[in-house]
């Protein structure tokens, strides 16, 4: 009986080796992936102080680090907006020199460069005793009455002076003002009995501080000057006229005394400067004979009341008067600065040619 053929002997039913190769390939792939993963993760291992470690991946940074970065960026932004203010050196004694009235229209840098090393302060004329304004004022009343004589370059000159290392004093004649007084006789000026503007021995005119328009004009000018950067404003001629035919002055319409009118103007000025955030000194100039006498009827000054609104009082005096004026000023409890023709040996002073 013949046997049934079943194919090649030993090979027809064996499949074990092919399955083993697939398993080995999968195992090798897993090992390779694990090795690559370990090498990748090794870059992000953070070891703690106790020897343990943790993984810190870029996409999972702690919140506090992101916050720190934001804060750092914010600080950088603040630094970009930072404004640096350079403070002037503190001045103990004011050793000032009055610059020429033409300094704002000339070479102010040369004027400062010509000062001696002892000088640490300068005084600049902004408005004179005729009412003329030495800078390009924007006050409408000053423009309308023709008082503005300073050109556009005067602002740059002022900025150069106030931006220097010198302590700066702006000098302003207040009530001795021919321009505005003539333009506004009835509303602002000291007038004659006839109603026409009064004039003194030099044929110049004065503003009447009991009149609202006069106070408003002076306040506008002083406030404008305060915004130019001066460390101090020195008010001059802040009184009624002292010379001339006083009997011809019209007084019957006054609603307050001369002293009260001066104090009202001083109060208006102080209030306006406070509102304008002016942080400098406000000072006033007084003649030596009034200081020594304590008061004067014609001017309307009573020293004990007059000085209350001011930080310093400047007094023009000779070397012979200096000792007695210094002694008299002690009674008023306000800082005193003599105005001299030459520098003093010590203390504060203003040299005026």
Regions found by a protein language model. Name each.
Residues 1-22:
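N-terminal Lys/Arg-rich, disordered targeting/topogenic segments
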Residues 85-100, 175-223:
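Active-site-adjacent "subsite" loops/lids of carbohydrate-active enzymes
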Residues 98, 167-176, 234-235, 256-299, ...:
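Aromatic-lined carbohydrate-recognition surfaces of secreted/lumenal glycan-active proteins
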Residues 121, 150-198:
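Glycine-rich, aromatic-flanked loop segments that form ligand/cofactor-binding clefts
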Residues 136-145, 177-198, 241, 245-253:
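Aromatic- and acidic-residue-enriched segments that line the glycan-binding/catalytic groove
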């Amino acid at each position: 009986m013949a046997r049934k053929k079943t194919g090649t002997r030993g090979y027809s039913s064996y499949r074990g080796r092919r399955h083993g190769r697939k398993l080995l390939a999968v195992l090798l792939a897993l090992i390779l992936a694990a090795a690559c993963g370990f090498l990748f993760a090794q870059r992000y291992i953070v070891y703690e102080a106790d020897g343990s470690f943790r993984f810190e991946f870029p996409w999972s940074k702690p919140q506090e680090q992101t916050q720190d970065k934001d804060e750092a960026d914010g600080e950088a932004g603040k630094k970009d907006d930072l404004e640096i203010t350079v403070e002037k050196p503190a001045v103990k004694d004011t050793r000032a020199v009055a610059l020429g009235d033409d300094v704002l229209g000339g070479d102010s840098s040369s004027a400062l460069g010509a000062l001696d090393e002892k000088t640490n302060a300068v005084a600049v004329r902004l408005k004179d005793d005729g009412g003329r304004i030495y800078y390009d004022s924007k006050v409408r009343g000053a423009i309308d009455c023709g008082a503005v004589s300073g050109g556009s370059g005067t602002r740059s000159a002022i900025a150069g002076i106030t931006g220097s290392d010198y302590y700066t004093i702006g000098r302003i004649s207040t009530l001795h003002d021919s321009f505005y007084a003539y333009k506004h006789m009835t509303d602002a000026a000291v007038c004659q009995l006839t109603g026409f503007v009064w004039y003194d021995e030099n044929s110049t005119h004065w503003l009447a501080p009991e009149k609202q328009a006069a106070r408003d004009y002076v306040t506008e000018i002083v406030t404008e000057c305060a915004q130019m950067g001066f460390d101090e404003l020195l008010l001059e001629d802040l009184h009624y006229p002292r010379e001339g035919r006083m009997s011809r002055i019209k007084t019957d319409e006054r609603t307050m005394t001369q002293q009260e009118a001066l104090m009202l103007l001083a109060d208006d000025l102080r209030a306006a400067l406070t509102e304008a955030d002016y942080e400098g000194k406000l000072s006033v100039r007084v003649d030596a004979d009034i200081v020594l006498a304590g008061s004067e009827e014609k001017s309307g000054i009573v020293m004990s009341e007059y000085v209350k609104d001011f930080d310093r009082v400047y007094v023009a005096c000779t070397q012979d008067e200096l000792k007695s004026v210094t002694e008299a000023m002690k009674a008023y409890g306000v800082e005193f600065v003599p105005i001299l023709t030459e520098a003093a040996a010590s203390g504060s002073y203003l040299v005026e040619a």
